[in-house]
A protein has these predicted regions:
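Short glycine-/acidic-enriched loop or helix-start segments at secondary-structure transitions
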Residues: 35-37, 117-118, 154
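ATP-binding N-terminal substructure of ATP-dependent carboxylate-amine bond-forming enzymes
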Residues: 1-55, 59-65, 72, 83-96
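Active-site nucleotide/adenylate-binding loops and adjacent lid/helix of ATP-dependent enzymes
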Residues: 14-18, 57-151
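Short hydrophobic/aromatic-enriched beta-strand-loop microsegments
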Residues: 48-52, 77, 165
């Protein structure tokens, strides 16, 4: 490949056309869009893009990695247990750790999934077993976190050298927690911009 030609290479039979791209805006959501995959493709093709680089995207999309990084720099966060077994073979060991370290209720999340897909709230052992099975359908790495009672707020940070925070939004879920349905299918869920905190 000629590294001097940047862009998307369209190959049709023996014909090759390079389609130049000035800059890409990766507006993909979730897996392959926010996990470093598309960013890596842009870098391989020599296409400039906006947003986080490959490492930042991959590390921040993976909830367990994010917890480890946050812990290393002293960010306070919910206590957690990580289950990284490829299947449910270590389920009993995970449940024992959860019951010893966290208690109930807990949130169970696939480590690499977005939009709260595969996320459950477990109030007891039976619900935890079901939640682990559901989360493992989305990713073999599963994060189990203690429940923290409080108001849920969100804030985006934009920019690299001179980052700026967006206004804070408070999430008012129309369900017990802000799951996939509450986010995308329930019109009763709301986000209040600049709430009274």
């Amino acid at each position: 490949r000629d590294h001097g030609k940047k862009g998307i290479w369209k190959v049709t039979g023996n014909d090759v056309e390079v389609i130049p791209i000035d800059v890409a805006f990766p507006v993909l959501h979730g897996k392959f869009g926010e996990d470093g995959t598309i960013q890596g493709l842009f870098e391989l093709a020599g296409i400039p893009y906006v947003g986080c680089d490959v490492l930042a995207s991959a590390a921040s999309m993976d909830k367990i990695s994010t917890k480890i990084f946050a812990d290393r720099i002293g960010v306070r966060q919910a206590a957690y247990v990580a289950d990284t077994a490829r299947d449910l073979s270590e389920k009993e060991e995970t449940i024992a750790k959860v019951e010893e370290k966290l208690g109930y209720p807990v949130f169970v999340k696939p480590s690499n999934a977005g939009s709260s897909q595969g996320v459950s709230k477990a109030h007891n052992r039976e619900e935890l077993e079901k939640a682990l099975a559901l989360a493992k359908k989305h990713d073999h790495r599963v994060l189990i976190e203690e429940t923290i009672i409080g108001r849920e707020v969100e804030c985006a940070v934009l920019g690299g050298q001179n980052p700026k925070a967006s206004p804070v939004g408070e999430i008012l879920a129309a369900a017990e927690f802000y799951d996939f349905d509450a986010k995308y299918n329930n019109a009763e869920s709301k986000t209040v911009i600049d709430p009274d905190l």
